[in-house]
């Protein structure tokens, strides 16, 4: 399936290790991305695929009517364009797993507002910021967030308030620059 948006999409695989990170609540990953594979990716139960999308590259609009309405309601043209690109990329990526056309996916929202594909055991989550998007795919519920490095004020207080005693000790032992990077 040749498509210009595929030039803006890369994929990385993450296989959950036996040792949970941060008590199994979160995993902070440094991933190496590769060009979008041509073949349909297979995803195991203990595996997550992370897709990275450049939202400023050309794309085709695959949005549903409700997604189109949401996009048109956005006041900022750049945010609107990034939303359209992220949702279109999501639909294109879903097609690699389901063999459906991008516009044929029946996406709804669960009881807590999380998007889901009706009639599928495939789970996904989307986040975007600063012209980039990450899309997480798994056979179990998955969440993903994209954060860019920024200055953090009152770092020591945040570490003390939100991390376990052991995690706080490990973070506090780092130099300020390393501590901020590890925190984020």
Regions found by a protein language model. Name each.
Residues 9, 14-18, 22-184:
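Core catalytic alpha/beta fold that binds nucleotide/phospho-ligands
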Residues 1-7:
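Extreme N-terminal basic, low-complexity initiation segments
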């Amino acid at each position: 399936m040749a498509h210009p948006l595929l030039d803006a999409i890369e994929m990385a695989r993450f296989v959950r290790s036996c040792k949970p990170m941060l008590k199994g609540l979160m995993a902070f990953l440094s991933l190496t991305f590769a060009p979008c594979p041509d073949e349909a990716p297979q995803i195991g139960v203990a595996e997550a695929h992370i897709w990275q999308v450049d939202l400023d590259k050309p794309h085709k609009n695959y949005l549903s009517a409700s997604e189109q309405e949401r996009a048109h309601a956005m006041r900022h043209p750049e945010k609107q364009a990034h939303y359209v690109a992220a949702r279109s990329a999501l639909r294109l990526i879903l097609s690699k797993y389901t063999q459906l056309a991008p516009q044929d996916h029946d996406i709804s929202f669960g009881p807590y507002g999380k998007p889901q594909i009706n009639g599928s055991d495939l789970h996904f989550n989307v986040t975007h910021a600063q012209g980039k998007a990450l899309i997480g795919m798994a056979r179990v519920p998955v969440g993903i967030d994209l954060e860019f490095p920024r200055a953090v004020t009152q770092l020591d207080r945040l570490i003390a308030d939100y991390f376990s005693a052991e995690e706080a000790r490990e973070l506090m032992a780092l130099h300020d620059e390393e501590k901020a990077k590890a925190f984020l």
